[in-house]
Design a protein with these regions (language model features):
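Anion-binding (especially nucleotide phosphate/pyrophosphate-binding) glycine-rich loop
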Residues: 1-31
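Short polybasic amphipathic segments
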Residues: 51-55
Length: 206
C-alpha cells in the first residue's frame, strides 16, 4: 500500500528474508511518496525494485495499473509529480531467501549510520535540495556556514546542511523562507542554483 512508511517496510522485508530494501530504513516517507519523488539514497531507489503501480486519476477517479517500463524515472523525478495520477499501491520485487539475521543486522547498521549523520530525532522531510552535478547540496550549504541558521521555528540542521528541521514551532512559511534564503546565498557565493527535492503546495513558487 502507498501509505506504508519506508522504515516499516524495511523491517518487514528483513524479517521475511527479502533482500534489497535495507537502505530504506532511515528514509522519512511512504512507499507512494518515495516512488512519486523517486526518493533514494546514493544510487538506490524503489524504482529499482518496482514492477508496477496502481494509480487513481484525481479528475476522473479511474483506477489503473502502470508498468515500470512505461514510467520515465529520472533523478528525484517521476511523471507523477506533473500529472493527475495518485499512487495508491505498488508491486515491488525483492530477492528472496536472504539470511534474516544478517538482513536485520544490516538494517540496524544502516539506521545507525543515518542517526549518526542526520537529524533523525527531529521532524524533517529528509533532504531538501537535489545534489548538483558533481557536487553535494549539503556540502555547499555547510561551506557557507549556514548550519544552525534559523527562520522562525525552522532551522538548518547542525548535523547535516541539506536538512531543515522543525526545532520548535515551525510553519510552512518559515520553511519556505529558509529554503529561499539558502538558494539565494548559495547562488550568490557559489554560482549554483539549488533545486528543491520537495514540492511546494499552496505557495506561489516558481
Amino acid at each position: 500500500e502507498a501509505g506504508v512508511m519506508l522504515p516499516t517496510m524495511s523491517n518487514i522485508l528483513a524479517k521475511k528474508g527479502l533482500q534489497g530494501g535495507e537502505w530504506t530504513v532511515g528514509i522519512p516517507g511512504t512507499v507512494g511518496g518515495s516512488i512519486c519523488m523517486n526518493a533514494g539514497s546514493k544510487q538506490l531507489s524503489l524504482a529499482n525494485n518496482l514492477l508496477s503501480v496502481r494509480v487513481i486519476d484525481t479528475k476522473t477517479l479511474k483506477i489503473s495499473e502502470i508498468e515500470k517500463k512505461d514510467i520515465n524515472f529520472q533523478y528525484r523525478f517521476s511523471p507523477f509529480q506533473q500529472n493527475n495520477l495518485m499512487i495508491i499501491s505498488a508491486k515491488l520485487l525483492f530477492e528472496p531467501k536472504g539470511n534474516i539475521e544478517q538482513l536485520l543486522e544490516t538494517t540496524q547498521k544502516n539506521l545507525k549510520k543515518k542517526t549518526d549523520t542526520q537529524p533523525y530525532h527531529l521532524p524533517s522531510f529528509g533532504s531538501v535540495f537535489k545534489n548538483p552535478t558533481n557536487n553535494y547540496a549539503g556540502k555547499l550549504i555547510e561551506e557557507l556556514g549556514l548550519k544552525g541558521f534559523k527562520i522562525g521555528g525552522a532551522e538548518i540542521s547542525t548535523m547535516h546542511g541539506n536538512f531543515i528541521v522543525n526545532n520548535s514551532s515551525a510553519n510552512s512559511k518559515d520553511i519556505l523562507d529558509l529554503i529561499t534564503v539558502i538558494q539565494q546565498k548559495v547562488l550568490q557565493k557559489k554560482g549554483i542554483f539549488l533545486e528543491p527535492e520537495v514540492r511546494m503546495i499552496g505557495f506561489d513558487y516558481p
